[in-house]
Design a protein with these regions (language model features):
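Rhodanese-like catalytic fold shared by cysteine-dependent sulfurtransferases
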Residues: 1-24, 31, 39-72, 78-113
Length: 113
């Protein structure tokens, strides 16, 4: 219950703009760009440099895939719903700097396949 209250109580994620994400990628800043869609969606096209971790596996696999809880993470999905859930989950697991880009539909650049 404490995790649930903590996660949703302080759980409003800060939304990253397209320009902010583009600048971070261009400067090659040290952060994780986390795609929380399905493997099939990821294969159809993803933002370059993204790491795939489906949102329904975040709780089970975050520790092994994202060992540094201080490293900034920017999360995205298709529309923004799953990324918001994943951001709250990651914060509840102790990740300190989690931001939400929302949906890949906001991305105006090229996609990798």
């Amino acid at each position: 219950v404490g995790l649930f209250i903590f996660g949703f109580g302080g759980g409003k994620s800060s939304l990253v703009s397209y320009e902010e994400l583009q600048a971070k990628l261009a400067k090659k800043e040290n952060f994780v760009l986390l795609d929380v869609r399905t493997p099939e969606e990821f294969a159809e096209g993803h933002i370059g440099g993204s790491v795939l971790l489906p949102y329904d596996q975040v709780e089970q696999k975050a520790a092994s895939l994202l060992p540094d809880k201080d490293k900034p993470i920017i999360v995205y999905c298709r529309s923004g719903r799953r990324s918001a859930i994943a951001a709250v989950t990651l914060r509840g697991l102790g990740y300190k700097d989690v931001k939400d880009f929302g949906g890949i539909s906001r991305w105006q650049g090229e996609l990798e396949r």
